[in-house]
Amino acid sequence: AFSSARMAAQMAYQTDKKIIDFQQMGFFKILFAADDTTILKSYEQQLLGPLEEHDQHHHSQYMETLRSYIENDRSLMGVAESTFTHRNTVNYRIQNIKKILNNPLKTAQDLFPYQVAFYIRDMKL
């Protein structure tokens, strides 16, 4: 019980939420249970590092676009609306992201590793 409470408190702190119920932590339970956070950081960097590096050198906003693409269930219109970007620009960015990541980003299985990587990033380890 103590470790569950500690995990929930840690998640609340690291995700800027006021209160977190351990039962509602869902997938985050697995991430917060990892004793070696360097593995999580390495995983996140391995997946998102190439996009982050591209953004830094080209001001391309690919990280924001990929996150929105995941959050909007691969809807280009959803990404366009949530990022205030033209649909054609979103399509162009997604095509480039696919090339950089060498991933078709077509299925939930293609996107899940990147969703996990964003979760890890949000944990502020």
What are these regions (language model features)?
Residues 1-125:
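Cytosolic nucleotide-utilizing catalytic cores of signal-transduction proteins
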